[in-house]
């Protein structure tokens, strides 16, 4: 990306939160990039960043397989901010002491600021932070002072202000840290001296140029589902290369109610794109017959999607690229070279080795909320930009266990009722994601004086900014009651409704 703005580099040491650090910085109007911990000091120097952040990670700095960085990075003279593992790595490098904690600390803790370094400027002396660590700094390196403590962590923050080196044992990038944003701001602006200058207009300008350079006079296929991500990808690429783009819409039978018809109307008629509709419902259902394992379902759906594209591409001339709506969160949840895998993602896993296309993923540095902003900037209607996040495997991972036509119909109809009532209640912009899922369990009920033994439908609704962390949504009881009554009365073979009150972490947003 052209350096028309200040940049903060984030080094990836494996934390599942590492993408959030870059995300928070971009919220401030400062560009941030995530790079592997193996990047060299020379490579960083060539990027001319204003500062460096070391992310957290699951390893121990003294353990076998510990991740390290090029030690010359410490000699660049740039401000460095170490978070959790990053602080421990800094401690080890400068001769301090890191040991295993007697009790691992996960969750909220009260931080007490002992030394108001630039990092804590204008912040309260006591604040709630999010801890997630099994090791502790027990001995400061020479030249460092203790900035903050907590009940279980005597050195929860440290600094060497002469060298612009800072470390914290907690995670300011996670929204559970109540002043985390302000603390990162203090590093970005107060320590590094950055100026605001990055926004979505910059991104569009640079990305359009990048797409044109990458594609040249070749042709691109776009996996269009009608969801936010694929819609924005399609419009962005169409804006860059026009009729060189062909969109293929695969109706795999795992879509929401009315979605297939809506996709064709919006993009073929509304945006005047070349959209080919493929009816592959029977093909997908045959492949998924008898399959219960969620990872296997994801892989099958991912593979079959690509095979369908292969079949369609063979009918077209000179298709070289496949466009996907892969986001930053997709990549981190599927694991990187350093991040531990949570689940394989539909845009990352399941791709066959002999795939005939080169991938083009213009959104893979953006978070979901940034994609919505991008969509609005591109002139995409609100009803698409604010559409509910919907996974590539569709309802296939909202039917737990084996997928059948009957179960799909239950999820499809119950989900339509949920969406309708949430919109009626004016909650559709407040709740980040909401859907129904079918856990596959049956229970006894009574309907019309008769005993029933039917399915339970689960409702999942969460509030979030970017999908990395989420809290369950406090939907008013009267709205939940309406939803419950309607689903039980209008959807066949359902006699019980449950509401998921689990946050992420420990749960993921989707049930599979």
From Swiss-Prot:
Gene3D superfamilies: 3.30.300.10, 3.40.50.880, HUPs
Enzyme class at the top of the EC tree: ligase
Domain (GMPS ATP-PPase): residue spans on this chain: 198-387
Pfam families linked to this entry: GATase, GMP_synt_C, NAD_synthase
Keywords: ATP-binding, Glutamine amidotransferase, GMP biosynthesis, Ligase, Nucleotide-binding, Purine biosynthesis
PROSITE patterns according to UniProt: GATASE_TYPE_1 (PS51273), GMPS_ATP_PPASE (PS51553)
Functional description taken from the UniProt entry: Catalyzes the synthesis of GMP from XMP.
Assembly behavior: Homodimer.
Name of the protein: GMP synthase [glutamine-hydrolyzing]
UniProt organism field: Bacillus cereus (strain G9842)
